[in-house]
């Protein structure tokens, strides 16, 4: 179905967003209600967990939405290690503990509860303890002060820390996790956080592996008390359809939203950034007056534009392949040779590729996670090998299997 064009289209009230945090008043978004409800169950049960997903997979947006979702019943302290903790703060326990405490205080003050006298009094006691101990304020003292604060206020505290990848290769951060573990185990004796939620690309076991390559400590992570976070954060075709229905309504557009949603999902497998970027490109074509923007032909054009552009996600993917050459070799084998590799997260390359969002489990076999990534990796490797005419010629002949006129493999 070709969308009807009108000369007096409504100005779009919202936009598709691919940078920063999404919020429903400014951006077209999928409905997160069910997902937030599932995460809340973990929080209500007092679980600590890690949201580790690939780059631009909606982690930060999820944390912000979750903070608002929990705010009626919990005091949510939201921190960001990338913004609040520089590398210098990880020099030793004292510098880390002081910096963490100050960041914690700042995040506490901007909460709604932080403006009440009762909460301000409890926070003031925490701050005074930090200042009084000074150079001797280390992790033990930090957690003792946190425990006192937790006991002094009515609401239970949920601590969220985004961008924990910036703590990679810092022993003091692992010691911080060990303190969290100790208080979690002894929570019946000492007041502590209701729940601790960490977010980043790497999981804590991978941080541990990079810190301590020796076998004795390889799998002995202080985060082994964490619950599994297996909530699907990708977008389903149904969720994409509901988002497109909002868009069509606001833009007075007749779009076959179900069909377009299925095609977008077919190319992206619901990878949040890729979904939003394709929609963004389609909207740009539509607003510029292109006939058939929100159609099959429009999607083919948007895909071609997307895989040829430079963006932060693709730049990060190229860097990862360079940093992990064996992973690049495996991707080549899958793309060019059709090599079958059993999916087993105990295999380091499979685990790393899955963590980066490059790979997925498809009926027990390793596959590249979506068609956009297939096309992009294919183009990357062909460009790298262009000097080898045999590789280039063979690859060029295969190109049609990825984007044909029908849009299918």
What name fits each language-model region?
Residues 311, 373-403:
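Short, amphipathic alpha-helical interaction segments positioned at domain boundaries
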Residues 41, 45-57, 61-176, 194, ...:
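P-loop NTPase nucleotide-binding core
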Residues 20-21, 156, 166-259, 266-267, ...:
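The catalytic "switch" region of P-loop NTPases
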């Amino acid at each position: 179905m070709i969308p009807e064009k009108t000369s007096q289209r409504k100005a779009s009230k919202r936009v598709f967003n691919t940078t920063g945090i999404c919020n429903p008043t400014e951006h077209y978004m999928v409905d997160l209600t069910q997902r937030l409800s599932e995460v809340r169950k973990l929080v209500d049960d007092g679980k600590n967990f890690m949201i580790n997903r690939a780059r631009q997979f909606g982690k930060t947006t999820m944390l912000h939405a979750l903070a608002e979702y929990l705010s009626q019943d919990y005091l949510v302290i939201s921190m960001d290690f990338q913004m609040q903790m520089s590398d210098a703060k990880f020099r030793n326990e004292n510098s880390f503990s002081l910096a963490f405490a100050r960041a914690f205080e700042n995040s506490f003050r901007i909460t709604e509860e932080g403006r009440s006298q009762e909460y301000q009094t409890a926070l003031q006691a925490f701050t005074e303890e930090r200042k009084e101990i000074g150079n001797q304020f280390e992790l033990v003292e930090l957690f003792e002060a946190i425990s006192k604060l937790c006991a002094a206020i009515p609401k239970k505290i949920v601590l969220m820390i985004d961008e924990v990848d910036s703590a990679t290769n810092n022993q003091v951060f692992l010691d911080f996790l060990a303190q969290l573990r100790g208080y979690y185990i002894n929570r019946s004796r000492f007041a502590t956080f209701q729940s601790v939620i960490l977010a980043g690309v790497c999981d804590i076991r991978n941080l541990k592996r990079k810190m301590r390559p020796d076998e004795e400590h390889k799998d002995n992570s202080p985060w082994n008390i964490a619950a599994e976070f297996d909530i699907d954060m990708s977008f389903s075709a149904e969720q994409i359809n509901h988002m497109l229905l909002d868009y069509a309504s606001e833009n007075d557009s007749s779009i076959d939203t179900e069909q377009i949603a299925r095609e977008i999902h077919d190319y992206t497998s619901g990878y949040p950034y890729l979904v939003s970027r394709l929609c963004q490109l389609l909207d740009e074509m539509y607003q510029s007056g292109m006939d058939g923007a929100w159609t099959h032909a429009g999607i083919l054009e948007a895909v071609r534009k997307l895989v040829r552009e430079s963006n932060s996600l693709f730049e990060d993917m190229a860097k990862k392949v360079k940093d992990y050459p064996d992973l690049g070799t495996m991707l080549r084998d899958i793309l060019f040779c059709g090599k079958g590799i059993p999916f087993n997260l105990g295999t380091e390359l499979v685990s790393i590729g899955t963590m980066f969002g490059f790979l997925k489990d498809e009926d027990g076999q390793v596959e590249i996670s979506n068609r956009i990534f297939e096309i992009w990796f294919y183009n990357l490797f062909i460009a790298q090998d262009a000097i080898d005419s045999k590789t280039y010629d063979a690859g060029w002949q295969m190109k049609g299997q990825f984007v044909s006129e029908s849009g299918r493999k």
